[in-house]
Amino acid sequence: MISNPIPWPNGARCACVISFDMDADSLIHIARPGDSHDRLYPISMGRYGPQVAVPRILETYRRLGIKQSFFIPGWCIETYPDAIEAILAGGHEIGHHGYLHEDPIDSPDQRRWFEKALEAHRKYCGGNPAGYRA
């Protein structure tokens, strides 16, 4: 038993955080940069997220009156601006999730990718992200 319990709103006994990573088809492009455009099956699976799942998730959370956190790579922010616009229009937040799941070799390389993702956030989301997840 906790000796100093946290007082949750409305008498709740706990809190739960659910968040989404919208990686879309970014993973195939970093894993197979030379021929990713020919790999239609994984690309199609990846596009399901921003094109089908996100609208369904947003509608569910709209009905429930819940706000959500999405962590989205910068490449996906640039590639799926309609999904980004819908997420933001619903009052949800978008966190920094790298640029393209790159594997930076050194600190300058890591900073370059991090900054590139920040640029996407500023351009498409209107400012800096509220948080970061690797």
Language model: regions and residue ranges:
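Catalytic alpha-helical scaffold of carbohydrate-active enzymes acting on polysaccharides/glycoconjugates
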Residues: M1-R133
